[in-house]
Amino acid sequence: MASVAVENNVVNHIAEEIIRPVADFSPSLWGDRFLSFSIDNQVETKYAQEIEPLKEQTRSMLLASGRKLSETLNLIDVIERLGIAYHFEKEIDEILDRIYNENSNFEGDVYNEDLCTCRLQFRLLRQHGYNISLKIFSKFLDGNGRLKESLASDVLGLLSLYEASHVRSHGEDILEDALAFSTTHLESATPHLEYPLKEQVRHALEQSLHKGIPRIEIQFFISSVYDKQAIKNDVLLRFAKLDYNMLQMLHKQELAEVSRWWKDLNFVNTLPYARDRVVECYFWALGVYYEPQYSQARVMLVKTIAMISIVDDTYDAYGTVDELAIYTDVIQRWDIKEIDSLPDYMKISYKALLDLYKDYEKEMSRDGRSHVVYYAKERLKELVKSYNIEAKWFIEGHMPPASEYLRNAFVTTTYYYLATTSYLGMKYAKEQQFEWLSKNPKILEGCVTICRVIDDIATYEVEKNRGQLSTGIECYMRDYSVSTKEAMAKFQEMGESGWKDINEGMLRPTPIPMEFLSRILNLARLVDVTYKHNEDGYTHPEKVIKPHIIAMVVDSFKI
């Protein structure tokens, strides 16, 4: 829950004084900065004309024969890190499929690559869903099954090993050792490295590639690594910069559209108790998908996040127990005729919520998919029920058992709801995908767990200082008679287990296409970035998210 300060408010013209836990949220950092933007058609046309031949040259590079395995893997890795792989998904999948099938167990003399290539191959294949064998590590182990100390001097190999260790699944102890081994030796080596490798290693230790938000990692790699390297492919670099700027224009246009929608709703004035974070909501949606084909999905998701943030703050930072009970019931009924039973301030968000979903149904009807909006509505109804339980615990000072807390708090992460909503605007999302998601598959549970425990760790001190009893850490400490440090260690362990669930859930054969699984992975990545160093980057964006937003939707590459 948000940090709150109790103050008196008179609402609905009722004479009696109502004590409300009103949150003291900071105003938006952005004002009307993103309210107006229109794409320069001449610039767009110029970029598109230059990109086309660069794209064909890149495709020719991918399809060229006679390359060494290491050269092929490095080319794919660079293309992915530069953010242009979405142009070549079919080609990359075919290449990796061939590499995997040629020697899936990595046994015998056919396999004799260096540390860097081995780890890169392992990571790329795992990230594309191939359950590559751990035998690929065998030649780098000593007689005790530990990584050879002689590897400690190979910085590029260590960096590749470090990145590969983050795609580990349950029971892969060798990768646990690899993470510790590579981290220790990279930290020791960093002060002695030359730029840009030094910056690349420093960044990786701060934010692993696998757990990073793709668009942020792309911007960093182009500007701080590849552009600074002595040896680079100028075609790929030029292509990447043009493509980044081209996409950024689309992103700015979307953000302007959403900002105008938000300003027209006027929640800043009519519901001043709530957070004004529409730009941060767009950052969140951009983290889930940045590619151009997901423009509709992005706009729908950012509106959903912004709206649920208002609902969250209504439960978290303003409503009374009685009001929230009515609000919860009315949302279950989902009928505009019920609006008169609500206090005046709740009518505003309730009507906006119903209007938003009416717009979704109209938009989805063009593709004959309006019926799948039902799944998002059901998740929303589930969410507000849990919000209501959480609010009642807080207001009444109740501390539930840890198991009961977690069961409810998994829902209030909003991630069951947001994962479902993220599929709405995806053109190929059919009822099958929504049905699968509605059953809370293990990969989704892993994502939700990560969000819950990392949030609880990050906000523990703030919530403790305001006397909140029903926090996950406090509940766990009481139930298991452990210290704060031990409880946090357990929650951290749960988060790591959640990542392993996600990594396993991405492996083939998958129940639904990778396109949909990637949304769940990206939601988990958003948590890793937004709560970095135990900061609540959404509520207090100036410390964590602001630099990323500027990099993603303000700063462009010089062409």
Swiss-Prot record:
Q: Which residues bind Mg(2+) 2?
A: D312, D316
- Which EC class does it fall in? lyase
Summary of subunit composition and partner proteins: Monomer.
Quote the record's binding site residues for Mg(2+) 1. D312, D316
Q: Does the keyword Transport apply?
A: no
Task: Cite the Gene3D superfamilies for this sequence.
Answer: Farnesyl Diphosphate Synthase (1.10.600.10), Terpene synthase, N-terminal domain (1.50.10.130)
From the UniProt record, give the pathway where this protein acts: Secondary metabolite biosynthesis; terpenoid biosynthesis
Question: What UniProt keywords apply to this chain's record, in alphabetical order?
Answer: Cytoplasm, Lyase, Magnesium, Metal-binding, Plant defense
**GO molecular function annotation:** 5-epi-aristolochene synthase activity; magnesium ion binding; terpene synthase activity
Q: How is the cofactor bound?
A: Binds 3 Mg(2+) ions per subunit.
- Principal place where this protein is found? cytoplasm
Task of the protein: Catalyzes the cyclization of trans,trans-farnesyl diphosphate (FPP) to the bicyclic intermediate 5-epi-aristolochene, initial step in the conversion of FPP to the sesquiterpenoid antifungal phytoalexin capsidiol. Produces germacrene A as an enzyme-bound intermediate that is not released by the enzyme, but is further cyclized to produce the bicyclic 5-epi-aristolochene.
UniProt organism field = Capsicum annuum
Question: In its UniProt entry, what is this protein called?
Answer: 5-epiaristolochene synthase
Which cofactors are named for this entry? Mg(2+)
Q: Which PANTHER family match?
A: ALPHA-HUMULENE_(-)-(E)-BETA-CARYOPHYLLENE SYNTHASE, OS04G0344100 PROTEIN-RELATED
Q: Which InterPro entries match?
A: Isoprenoid_synthase_dom_sf, Terpene_cyclase_plant_C1, Terpene_synth_N, Terpene_synth_N_sf, Terpene_synthase-like, Terpene_synthase_metal-bd, Terpenoid_cyclase/PrenylTrfase
Record's subcellular location:
Cytoplasm
Name the gene behind this protein: EAS
The tissues in which it is expressed are: Expressed only in treated leaves an not detected in control leaves.
Q: Which reaction does it catalyse?
A: (2E,6E)-farnesyl diphosphate = (+)-5-epi-aristolochene + diphosphate
Annotated Gene Ontology cellular components are:
cytoplasm
Q: Does the keyword Magnesium apply?
A: yes
Which positions in this protein are listed as binding Mg(2+) 3? D455, T459, E463
